[in-house]
Structure formats: structure tokens, C-alpha cells
Curated annotation (Swiss-Prot):
Keywords: Amidation, Disulfide bond, Ion channel impairing toxin, Neurotoxin, Secreted, Signal, Toxin, Voltage-gated sodium channel impairing toxin. One of its GO terms (cellular component) is extracellular region. Expressed by the venom gland. It comes from Tityus fasciolatus (Central Brazilian scorpion). This is Beta-toxin Tf1a. Disulfide bonds join 31-81, 35-57, 43-62, 47-64. Residues 1-20 form the signal peptide. Beta toxins bind voltage-independently at site-4 of sodium channels (Nav) and shift the voltage of activation toward more negative potentials thereby affecting sodium channel activation and promoting spontaneous and repetitive firing. The toxin induces a leftward shift, on all channels tested (including Blattella germanica and Varroa destructor Nav1), displacing a change in voltage dependence activation to more hyperpolarized potentials. In addition, the toxin mostly inhibits peak current of hNav1.4/SCN4A (53% inhibition of peak current at 100 nM) and hNav1.5/SCN5A (71% inhibition). The modification Cysteine amide is found at residue 81. Its main location: secreted. It comes from the Eukaryota.
Amino acid sequence: MKGMILFISCLLLIGIVVECKEGYLMDHEGCKLSCFIRPSGYCGSECKIKKGSSGYCAWPACYCYGLPNWVKVWERATNRCGKK
């Protein structure tokens, strides 16, 4: 019984520590990375380059899952797109 409780506790701890980020990728200007006229699989490739687990075109921008915490993703509160 103690072993089962320890096992479940470890799983919960791993879930907290291995938390990953998700969101819209940004271009060099701080805007969402567009996929409007890109080929199929473009967003998945871009997400993999950023070490994400997967991604897709959430028209019209690339959305990624499983990104490391160092990757900057677009956020409404800190949006700098088109601003100087």
C-alpha cells in the first residue's frame, strides 16, 4: 500500500515538474507566425525547430504544444505586434 501511494505521488510530482508551454509562435516583430499561405506541415516543422512536441495551423497562425519554457509565445497582454 505504501508503495502504491509513493508511486502515485511520484507521478503527480513528475506532472508538475515536466509542465510544458503551448501557444502561438511569434515572428521577429512580435506578431503571430502566419501560416495563411504556407504548405501543409509548415507549423509542425516550425514547432519542432523550437523543440515543441507538435503544432498545427490554427488559421491564420501557428499554434504549438509542448514548448520549452524559454520559447516566447504570443500573449494578448504583452502584444507588441505593429507597435513601435
